[in-house]
Amino acid sequence: MARSLKKGPFVDDHLMSKIAKLNETEQKQVVKTWSRRSTIFPQFIGHTIAVYDGRKHVPVYVTEDMVGHKLGEFAPTRTYKGHDADDKKTRR
């Protein structure tokens, strides 16, 4: 179920304040965050946000196409190594 339009998009306050400070000083630093649930706002464009995937912080460079999506969509939590090759000799 999608979020109600009357509520508006969600972003954590600490993340928004960090980005606002960087925009005021026009600095480009990597911002570390654990907030995968935050929506990407237009103010985030051009910044690199390190999103936690449960193991490490994955750097995500925010572009215009990402606005409206969640930060967690760009930092996968599971590593897929593929299925094993067909082992025909054990199957009869």
From Swiss-Prot:
The keyword Cytoplasm does not apply. Gene3D superfamilies: 30s Ribosomal Protein S19, Chain A. GO terms for cellular component: cytoplasm; small ribosomal subunit. PROSITE patterns: RIBOSOMAL_S19 (PS00323). GO terms for molecular function: rRNA binding; structural constituent of ribosome. InterPro entries: Ribosomal_uS19, Ribosomal_uS19_bac-type, Ribosomal_uS19_CS, Ribosomal_uS19_SF. One of its GO terms (biological process) is ribosomal small subunit assembly. Pfam families: Ribosomal_S19 (PF00203). The keyword Ribonucleoprotein applies. Keywords: Ribonucleoprotein, Ribosomal protein, RNA-binding, rRNA-binding. Protein S19 forms a complex with S13 that binds strongly to the 16S ribosomal RNA. Belongs to the universal ribosomal protein uS19 family. HAMAP family: Ribosomal_uS19 (MF_00531). This is Small ribosomal subunit protein uS19. It comes from Bacillus anthracis. The lineage of its organism: Bacteria, Bacillati, Bacillota, Bacilli, Bacillales. The gene is rpsS.
